[in-house]
Amino acid sequence: MIGVDTNILVRYFTQDDAEQAKIVEQIIDTHATSAHSLFINNIVIVELIWVLERGYKYQKEEIAKLIKQILSTEEFAFENHKLLWLALAQYNQNNLDFSDALIGEINKEACCIETLTFDKSAIKARNFTLAQRKF
């Protein structure tokens, strides 16, 4: 198994650098020949979404479709495949960042009863509670 960094996926999906995109295509053709031969960790997915949103101005719907495609690719292995799917569902259903959705899902998987936050958009999602002072 070989791990890939965010920029590998950015080049592959945006094709914004022809030379690097060609290298990435060769890597995928060579190493993505059997199930789970390329490893994508959680941070790579979070960074990819951030880069596509901020740097390339992709819309949320485009990003969600792309992440679904990545998560459905048999030749990719993931750090937390199930949690990435759950975070994607939260990202689609609520007005929150994918990173927040993933934080909530990871914490729930780690048996946290809630995730405290001051982020008012994150509290719209499951697993989050507004942190406040108790008297």
Per-region residue spans from a language model:
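Acidic, PIN/NYN-like endoribonuclease modules and their adjacent C-terminal/linker elements
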Residues: 1, 104-135
